[in-house]
From Swiss-Prot:
Keyword Chaperone applies: yes
Protein's job: Participates actively in the response to hyperosmotic and heat shock by preventing the aggregation of stress-denatured proteins, in association with DnaK and GrpE. It is the nucleotide exchange factor for DnaK and may function as a thermosensor. Unfolded proteins bind initially to DnaJ; upon interaction with the DnaJ-bound protein, DnaK hydrolyzes its bound ATP, resulting in the formation of a stable complex. GrpE releases ADP from DnaK; ATP binding to DnaK triggers the release of the substrate protein, thus completing the reaction cycle.
Protein name per the record: Protein GrpE
Gene3D superfamilies xref list: 3.90.20.20, Head domain of nucleotide exchange factor GrpE
Stretches assigned to coiled coil: none
Length: 171
């Protein structure tokens, strides 16, 4: 008198079928979650590319706005008539003011002229375009032919300089 119920094969098959359906539903849910995650990643990638492109395109926006007064000043100078010594003096003063505006705009962008310091030749900051024999110490900057510039800690352009060298007899 064993009262244990044995499941019939059809009941087992129904249970297995229900379990298969359950697993299929779970697999479909995981697949949909996976596809959604892939779409999110693709959207994130596209958004990042757009931000990088915008940053590249508009990075100089602030700098360009700083240069507009310089352009205005130059246009004003070109539009004014130049007659006589007084006009030339005013034009020179206007050019000096424009150069000051320009230097301020460059400074706000982190661009600065290379300072000569103690006048020693530095191959990282200077490009020697002439060597001149002198009685003094060798490898000294004698003249700057074109200013060099740095942007923060990066060299934009080296200074073009003449450098001293020892006389031939002393070599």
């Amino acid at each position: 008198m064993n009262e244990e119920k044995e499941e019939s094969p059809s009941t087992e098959a129904e249970g297995a079928g229900a379990e298969v359906v359950n697993w299929e539903e779970r697999a479909e849910t995981y697949r949909n979650d996976y596809l959604r995650a892939l779409a999110d990643i693709e959207n994130l990638r596209k958004r990042h590319e757009k931000q990088v492109e915008d940053a590249r395109n508009y990075a100089v926006d602030r700098f360009a706005r700083e240069l507009l007064p310089v352009v205005d000043s130059l246009e004003l100078a070109l539009a004014s008539p130049v007659e006589g010594a007084e006009s030339i003096a005013l034009l020179r003063q206007g050019l000096e003011n424009t150069l000051t505006l320009f230097a301020k705009a460059l400074g706000k962008a982190g661009i600065a002229p290379i300072e000569m310091g103690e006048g020693r030749f530095d191959p990282h900051l200077h490009q020697a375009i002439a060597m001149v024999e002198t009685e003094g110490e060798a490898n000294r900057v004698l003249a700057v032919h074109q200013k060099g510039y740095v942007m923060h800690d990066r060299l934009l352009r080296p200074s073009m300089v003449s450098v001293s060298k020892a006389p031939k007899a002393a070599q």
